[in-house]
């Protein structure tokens, strides 16, 4: 196949360590991914939601106006739509420690995935960056 000798890296949220969707098999979601040959990189616990949203925003455009995160319009239209339409739950703002993403529209799944990889590689907050070299990302 086209990607035969390539590593596929997954950046899921920390809840995959728990026996949730895979409880019937007695393994974790992470174990299922690893057993299928995927490399799994995730934090031991979720960072504050605001930090992960800020990590994405900083890659989309930092304080100096630099952009390091791009989306291919032809290949990722649902991801773009998700990032553009995911909002904070009413009554919560980005400055609040207990901010919540509004999941009532059902559009946040793709933007959640973008948050997980961006926060893991380019964290805002307590965690140290997991990158070895600086690069521009595109989806």
Feature roles, as predicted:
Residues 104-126:
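Acidic, Mg2+-coordinating catalytic module of metal-dependent nucleases/exonucleases
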Residues 132:
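Phosphate-handling catalytic cores of nucleic-acid transaction enzymes
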Residues 1-99, 124-125, 136-139:
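Mg2+-dependent endonuclease catalytic cores in nucleic-acid-processing enzymes, primarily RNase H-like
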């Amino acid at each position: 196949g086209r990607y035969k000798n390539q590593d596929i890296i997954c950046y899921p949220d920390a809840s995959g360590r728990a026996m949730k969707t895979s409880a019937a098999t007695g393994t974790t979601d992470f174990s299922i991914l690893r057993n299928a040959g995927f490399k799994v990189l995730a934090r031991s616990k979720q960072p504050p939601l605001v930090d992960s949203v800020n990590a994405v925003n900083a890659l989309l455009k930092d304080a100096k106006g630099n952009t390091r995160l791009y989306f291919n319009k032809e290949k990722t239209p649902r991801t773009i739509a998700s990032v553009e339409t995911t909002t904070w739950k009413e009554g919560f703002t980005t400055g609040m420690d207990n901010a919540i993403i509004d999941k009532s529209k059902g559009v946040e799944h793709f933007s959640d995935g973008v948050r997980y990889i961006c926060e893991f590689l380019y964290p805002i907050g307590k965690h140290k960056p997991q990158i070895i070299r600086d690069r521009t990302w595109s989806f």
